A protein has these predicted regions:
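N-terminal lobe of the biotin/lipoate ligase/transferase fold
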Residues: 1-89, 110, 117
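Long, positively charged amphipathic alpha-helical accessory segments at protein N-termini or as interdomain linkers
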Residues: 5, 64-69, 73-94, 104-250
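Conserved active-site carboxylates
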Residues: 101
Length: 250
């Protein structure tokens, strides 16, 4: 796998997609940058990043065995790896805020954006992208955002941080499940581990639906397909949502 550090770049994910468009990428790659100027998250949200303070990281995996039906496994594997990696640095109170954020307490410290490329209804390649807030201290009216430095009161060497990340990717065999028949993966254990780290699980939260309506309920679980199950307040039945239908109000 080739590893490339980029200087100032709009988005490491977008850079990879441009290479794909031009058919100039034909093997697995890692691209990373400390100066991403136009990072994006799910639903087109912008990831605000000061130069040389944070890490933008994208992995390109060609010809994976993950299929469309089980593609949420990509998110599960990525989220659990990042939790494990940040735990190495003793970041406290880590959890996964469905569908694509990593939290420390009630503060977002990492966003994930995984993208698939299709060919004849099959996944031809995967871009696994995430950004970790490391040394940034100002988040411009983003009250729920934070960084490792703000949380631990420590300054981090970005180069060393990235070296440890890449080393752990290899040591933990992170890439293996993407090239393994998904039917042979222990999906029950994966989703159980994911739910054990689910942000505000079993707690009453407020949610905004895609039609603008607000409702309140307890987060129960996420299933292997990425569906969030919520028990509505004062009711015993579950309501199920995909990531485009609902947003948690922190």
């Amino acid at each position: 796998m080739k590893i490339i550090k980029l200087d100032a770049i709009n988005s490491t994910n977008d850079y990879l997609k441009e290479l794909l468009k031009n058919k100039s990428i034909k093997k697995n790659y890692i691209f990373y940058s400390y100066n991403q100027t136009n990072g994006k998250g799910q639903r087109g949200n912008v990831w605000y990043s000061e130069p040389d303070k944070n890490l933008a990281f994208s992995l390109f995996l060609l010809s994976p065995t993950v299929n469309l039906k089980t593609q949420f496994i990509i998110n599960i594997l990525t989220s659990l790896f990042i939790i494990d990696f940040l735990d190495y640095f003793k970041i406290p109170n880590l959890s996964i805020k469905w569908p694509n954020d990593i939290m420390s307490g009630n503060k977002k410290i990492c966003g994930i954006l995984n993208e698939i490329q299709l060919k004849k209804k099959h996944i031809e390649s995967i871009i696994i992208g995430f950004g970790i807030n490391i040394n940034q201290e100002n988040f411009n009216n983003l009250p729920n955002a934070s960084s490792l430095k703000l949380i631990t009161k420590k300054n981090y060497d970005l180069n060393n941080f990235t070296k440890i990340l890449i080393k752990k990717l290899k040591k933990n065999n992170f890439f293996v499940p993407f090239f393994t028949d998904t039917e042979t993966l222990n999906q029950e254990n994966l989703i159980s581990s994911y739910n054990n780290k689910l942000y505000c699980r079993k707690k009453l939260k407020s949610f905004k639906l895609s039609n603008g309506k607000i409702f309140h309920g307890n987060i129960e679980s996420v299933d292997i397909n990425g569906i969030l199950n919520v028990k509505e307040k004062n009711h015993s039945f579950l309501r199920s949502f995909n990531s485009n239908e609902i947003k948690m109000i922190i």
